[in-house]
């Protein structure tokens, strides 16, 4: 494994451990970003289960024929995730950006989730 991958993996693990400790029992909104799509899920770490999830791969997102690798797709995923989390009764979460910078698609997803009712 290259030095960059090792450093990235350590950072991810460190961030997640800090979030679990300081989360106060709140679910975690985890973001994964690939070059073509973006995925997000709300995870209850105490029970070890996913409460809600959304991605740019879903059929409702792909109908427009757009790519999942842009800011508009990230906003749509954030809005959809917040709606699904609200259906499950989740209002407050801890944002887990992993090793990604809070910029671009990650920021757009977070802002859309906030506007749709999630607080973090």
UniProtKB/Swiss-Prot annotation:
Family, as annotated: Belongs to the universal ribosomal protein uL18 family.
Region (Disordered): 1-26
Complexes and interactors: Part of the 50S ribosomal subunit; part of the 5S rRNA/L5/L18/L25 subcomplex. Contacts the 5S and 23S rRNAs.
Keyword DNA damage attached: no
GO BP of this protein: translation
Extent of Basic residues compositional bias: 8-23
Cellular component terms per the entry's GO annotation: cytosolic large ribosomal subunit
Disulfide bonds: none
PANTHER family (alphabetical): 39S RIBOSOMAL PROTEIN L18, MITOCHONDRIAL, LARGE RIBOSOMAL SUBUNIT PROTEIN UL18M
Keywords annotated in UniProt: Ribonucleoprotein, Ribosomal protein, RNA-binding, rRNA-binding
Primary role: This is one of the proteins that bind and probably mediate the attachment of the 5S RNA into the large ribosomal subunit, where it forms part of the central protuberance.
Domain of life the protein comes from: Bacteria
Protein's recorded name: Large ribosomal subunit protein uL18
InterPro entries: Ribosomal_uL18_bac-type, Ribosomal_uL18_bac/euk
Gene3D superfamilies linked: 3.30.420.100
Source organism of this protein record: Bradyrhizobium diazoefficiens (strain JCM 10833 / BCRC 13528 / IAM 13628 / NBRC 14792 / USDA 110)
Sample GO molecular function, one term: structural constituent of ribosome
Signal peptide range: none
Pfam families: Ribosomal_L18p (PF00861)
């Amino acid at each position: 494994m290259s030095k960059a991958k090792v450093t990235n993996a350590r950072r991810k693990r460190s961030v997640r451990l800090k979030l679990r400790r300081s989360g106060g029992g709140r679910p975690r909104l985890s973001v994964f970003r690939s070059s073509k799509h973006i995925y997000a899920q709300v995870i209850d770490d105490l029970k070890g289960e996913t409460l809600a999830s959304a991605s740019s791969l879903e059929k409702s997102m792909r109908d427009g024929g757009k790519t999942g690798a842009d800011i508009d797709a990230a906003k749509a995923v954030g809005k959809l995730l917040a709606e699904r989390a609200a259906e499950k009764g989740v209002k407050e979460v801890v944002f887990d950006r992993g090793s990604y910078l809070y910029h671009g698609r990650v920021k757009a997803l977070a802002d859309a989730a906030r506007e749709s009712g999630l607080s973090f």
